[in-house]
């Protein structure tokens, strides 16, 4: 009898010691990996045993048993969320469980500014480590995601909505372009679609015009005015004479070096709006919400011309003679003064300290030459 009692006592003591050890480990920070950071993927539908084994293998917790004890103590067994998690410091099992219960998954924040082409977006995709740029371009060449919205689309240029995205580390190009086109469709509110229909504009025309507006001005107050200029030109059959469309053609041909030359304006491309009337074949960049709204709600104006003031704004004109005066003031005189080293050139920022870009005078002459 004494031996039985002794045996029971030993078992109780050992069990208590084991429980105490497990209890202490639950509250003991642990780090079993040598790298600066460790990533663990928790699959959808994974059970507590599988999660514990993954965490133990990655060195996040000491062992799967300790994790399960901690999970039982926490009462959060049904709250753990799937996803990829990043760990970079010692953590107790309870802290690990709290992280998984909150769904504090690791994401990469990526910003795609307004006005980028799909090729420029592809470089951002690659720069953030998601994969080669050409995989993004390949995915963007497939117009399937927006065929219901725009049957005329040849690719996703213009439909990859520009904004900041929080993405899982292993996001592939196909998944991202689907997300971006889905976001684009969400931005197309019923009011915006109704405004387009009221103006008898197809979605292809809306996005194409909006992309031009996006490239021409970054000022919110000017977008409706720029849209109004191009709407007026389209109405009377006047060439759009839009530099960004020519630049886009050169970019697609791999011939753009940062400068636009007079000879480029006669190049044979359907995107050359100096040579071919009407809108180009499709969007030349990804417009933001404001540019889309401007395209369907342009300013009610009789402006036909505009020219840069070299401070981010533009001077608008109704007649060609008025436009020529603006060009002389804000372009010809401005760059002439810069070359002469005079400070405070009209419309400039910093006078002679502002760098004179190659081809600026040629651009001024082009602006003066734009007419019906």
List where the protein language model places each region.
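Hydrophobic alpha-helical membrane-insertion segments, chiefly the h-region
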Residues: 13-23
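Signal peptide-directed extracytoplasmic domains
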Residues: 21-188
